[in-house]
Amino acid sequence: PGVAPAEREVSVTVGQVDLLATLADVTGATVPANAGEDSVSFLPLLRGDAAWRPAREGVVHHSADGRFAIRAGKWKLLLWPGSGGWSSPTPTPSRWLPVEATDLSTLPKYQLYDLESDLAERHNVADAHPEVVQRLGRLLRRYIEDGRSTPGPAQPVDRTI
């Protein structure tokens, strides 16, 4: 209250992961270099700085099944033919939702969605935009190899793509 202008929309992509850095910024806490490796404070946006942009090119997503995705601008790339485990299609019946197992070998290896025109992620456009798949795939690989998507020292990683 009293910090963020009311009823304002911004077009900058932030994620749940950014709450750590933002709340640390609000409270004056310091986030160690080996914590919150993908977290960026969006406090400047809350204060009304419409020109602010995060110090990263894309937001990394990690599913319940341990699958990676990346969102950059209007694009979202999933390096997995399924849903990530929370809904169909998934390779095993879900423990949380009543969904059937799907043979993922019948589905495309990559999924690319244009979230400006397809927010529901119904139309995979990976074949139509191979250059975007390559660019975002390289970016995600770099983030994973560095153990972070934000500036700072590289961190150990426990997953690869």
Kindly label every feature range from the protein language model:
Residues 63:
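Glycine-rich phosphate/pyrophosphate-binding beta-alpha loops
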Residues 57-60:
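WW-domain-binding short linear motifs
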Residues 45, 55, 160-161:
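C-terminal helix-and-tail extensions that cap enzymatic domains
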Residues 1-52, 123:
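Substrate-binding rim/cap in mid-to-C-terminal beta-strand-loop elements of soluble/periplasmic
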Residues 19, 72, 83-85, 91-111, ...:
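Long, internal low-complexity/basic segments
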